[in-house]
Amino acid sequence: MPSRRQFIGITGASALAAAAPTRLQAEAARSNNDSQTQGYRPVRTLNGWTLPYTLKDGVKEFHLRAEEIDHEFAPGTQAKCWGYNGSTPGPTIEVVEGDQVRILVTNALPEHTTIHWHGIILPSGMDGVGGLSQPQIRPGETYAYEFEVQQHGTHMYHPHADEMTQIAVGLMGMLVIHPKQPEAKPADRDYCFMLHLSLIHI
């Protein structure tokens, strides 16, 4: 398990089959999140993007890939980080209260990881606490989180495996759960913006 200093020297994770969509692929598949077909107004993540899904037997299936990335904090300022599907913060996941969801998480990192769905009501085995509520997701493995969404609100996802390091280097994202009953006065626009402080020595 690398220290924060050692992390800078990590050159890359093992190459795995890339089932997880990238930002460009997600933008091409934006129709998944059209308000006319989904019954809600999609959020716009100002410093991110929305993860598309496929519908399989009534289950919304998403793919996340934890991996090392090159992240540009500002023009000319780039650093090695960890992220999901090529970005940090990771893509925003949008679902609706009452949805049955399956989120397949592939670990392309050099150490084990998990995903904890912060503030979400779900079965203990889906809560993402490695070694307690589930096995650690080891390098090269894929773990399936599957649960029914029982509430609405704005939440986040992040690891519960060496979280002081893994969150610090970029593993986090937004989870937006739309209410089953539409708002009486829907907003014209709905935005997400995730704040994360990074200290870079240049």
What is each residue range found by the language model?
Residues V176-C192:
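Low-complexity, Pro/Ser/Thr- and charge-rich linker/hinge segments at domain boundaries
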Residues Y53-L55, T165-I167, P182-P186:
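A general structural signal for short secondary-structure junctions and capping/turn motifs
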Residues E61-I177:
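Histidine- and aromatic-enriched segments that form or immediately flank copper-ligand environments
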Residues M1-A15:
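N-terminal secretory signal peptides and thylakoid transit peptides that target proteins
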Residues P21-E61:
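C-terminal segment of N-terminal export signals and the immediately downstream linker at the start
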Residues I200-I202:
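Conserved small/polar residues in nucleotide/adenosyl-binding loops
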Residues E163, P179-E183, L197:
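Short, well-ordered alpha-helical segments in soluble proteins
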